[in-house]
Amino acid sequence: REIALSVTVSGYTSRPCETDSTPFVTAANTTTRRGVIALSRDLVRRYTPGAPFNFGDVVHLNGIGDFVVEDVMAGRWERHADIWFESLDEARLFGRRRAVLTGPYGPGDAYQASQRGVAQVASGRGGAAP
């Protein structure tokens, strides 16, 4: 069943001050890369029973692109999505915006989705430009 939610969207990087002690490893135990998205814990079933999304789900942010859910945000956030970027400059350029988050598409298969190119975004390297 497809879900559509209005969320705040921002960008994050693998800087230790923005993550935990393993800045290049996601909560789903994958490596950070373009196309990875972190959702607030209220949106991820592992942390909130009945939440709409699981790790590995492909989600769409209107006007931004498609992403694979592989990370979560700190517990203080709600109805929020955080897109992973390689650099702080890219994350700052993206800024903070509102978008409609839809999905899930292709639940449970983050690796295959990323290999199909579903989860590419940003700065002239394919996928949707933010």
Where would I find each of the regions flagged by the language model?
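Solvent-exposed, well-ordered loop and adjacent helix/strand elements within mature globular domains
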Residues: 1-130
